[in-house]
Amino acid sequence: MVKEKEYYERLGVKPDCTEDELKKAYRKMAVKYHPDKNQGPGKDAAEAKFKDISEAYEVLSDPEKRKMYDSYGSEGMKESGFHASSAEDLFSHFFGAGGGGGGFSFGGGGGDDFGGFSFGNMGGMGGMGGMGGGHKKRRKGEDIEHEMNRSLEELYNGKLVKISISRDEVCKTCKGSGSNKPGVTTTCPTCNGSRYVFQKKQVGPGMIQQVQTACHTCHGTGEKIKEEDKCKECKGKRVIQGKKIVQFQVEKGTRDGERIMLQGQGSEYPGVPPGDVIITIREKPNVNFKRNGDNLIYTKRLKLLDSIAGSQFIINTLDQRKLWVNHEKGDIIKQGDMRYIENEGMPIKGTSRKGKLIIAFDIEYPSNLTNDDIEKLSKILPKAATPSVSKSDCKSVGLSKVNFNTNEQSSHGGAGGAYQQHGGAYGHQKQQQQGFNPADFGAQFGGGGPQQAQQCQQQ
């Protein structure tokens, strides 16, 4: 059983797919989304897709990386030090560009899966072991990936954001040549001009990962300059570290994990366009609302009388408005019940509409009642059911309160521990300590999956 399926889904294959099925899926999708084939309005989206499928194929085509991904998922890959290679380098290696003549080009159409793509004389495709095959020219500078935490209020209202990034910039002293003298470069002896070397890294018991990194001798250029000939400013690296302020708009309705691409704002390299800056948005938790797709879930605590006799209350929205909510008399609300308000949820990106504001009710019962109160209630509320067997045929037992604030344990693990282990019902005492969590019930409003919807229907 694999931990997650995202990489498989990017390529449209199943987790038990064969190596040939992986290659076929990557070949078809890489050609479809290659930047050279997508120059129209959807260029940015196609380029992001191209990078996603390349990252997925790089991992799944390597048996060691695939084994690690299946066991630990993408987070485990990150923790092991994995960084995706250039999508263009992977594409070039796969289709044989730079490996021994031939190459590839994009035509104007074609009726097959490859849409006019010409493979030419590619030679052998080979495996992913060495990424060799001679010097591969960069298509552009390196991309810079950045994760950014944004509040739910900002994702609701939208926000213009400015950040400072560190990036490589072409050295102005040597104009990116790495030397102040012409014609002094030679092929790097360490990487043989390929710009990359591979290092083995132990990431777990009996697990060795082969990590591709930029050559430490030539700093990923594929060329070597004698020490005495190197530019004094960049030390022969052709680029220096610089800072750049970038600005972008977080659109209303942006979701957790969504990526924003700032084209041409990434690292520079001589003779090629700059790379991109890719911002991944992470949603910070909110104390009042929980997001469920396009819906917002708000927990409202009601006293027992209000849940029966009706009530009015205020909800402060994420854009500083106030909603006067009228709960009509006769609409009896039970513990765990939900109601919703149309068009008061999260903005739906690209539209003027919003999702639903779902109100999940947590009913507050009185902590104690007098005999007089009980007598009055017994005249109004339905009578309790009488057991159908004789008391003399049963063992008579009483009830004791469970205290969730203590660490007392019985020989069977303690009532509180058992309650928390098995989930329990949403009892009043547990709610006071932890609060009602309605996240599992959002599916019926369009925010969750089939399992969540089934749970909601069973309430």
From Swiss-Prot:
The UniProt entry lists membrane topology as: Lipid-anchor
The stretches annotated as zinc fingers (CR-type) lie at 158-243
Q: Which GO terms describe its biological process?
A: protein refolding; response to heat
**Which Pfam families does this UniProt record tie to the protein?**
DnaJ (PF00226), DnaJ_C (PF01556), DnaJ_CXXCXGXG (PF00684)
**Its principal location?**
membrane
GO cellular component annotations of the record: cytoplasm; cytosol; endoplasmic reticulum; membrane; mitochondrion; nucleus; perinuclear region of cytoplasm
Q: Locations of Low complexity compositional bias?
A: 418-435
Modified sites of kind Cysteine methyl ester: 456
Q: Which UniProt keywords apply?
A: Chaperone, Cytoplasm, Endoplasmic reticulum, Lipoprotein, Membrane, Metal-binding, Methylation, Microsome, Mitochondrion, Nucleus, Prenylation, Repeat, Zinc, Zinc-finger
InterPro entries in alphabetical order? DnaJ, DnaJ_C, DnaJ_domain, DnaJ_domain_CS, DNJA1/2-like, HSP40/DnaJ_pept-bd, HSP_DnaJ_Cys-rich_dom, HSP_DnaJ_Cys-rich_dom_sf
User: What GO MF terms are annotated?
Assistant: ATP binding; Hsp70 protein binding; protein-folding chaperone binding; unfolded protein binding; zinc ion binding
Q: Enumerate the subcellular locations listed in this protein's record, separating them with semicolons.
A: Membrane; Cytoplasm; Microsome; Mitochondrion
What range(s) does the J domain occupy?
6-73
Q: Where is this region: Disordered?
A: 405-459
- What Gene3D superfamilies does the record point to? DnaJ domain, Heat shock protein DnaJ, cysteine-rich domain, Urease metallochaperone UreE, N-terminal domain
The positions annotated for binding Zn(2+) 1 are 171, 174, 231, 234
Q: Where does Zn(2+) 2 bind?
A: 188, 191, 215, 218
Show the PANTHER family listed in the entry: DNAJ-LIKE-2, ISOFORM A-RELATED
Provide the function of this protein: Co-chaperone for Hsp70 family members. Plays a role in protein transport into mitochondria and in the regulation of apoptosis via its role as co-chaperone.
Recorded protein name is DnaJ homolog subfamily A member 1 homolog
Q: Which organism is it from?
A: Dictyostelium discoideum
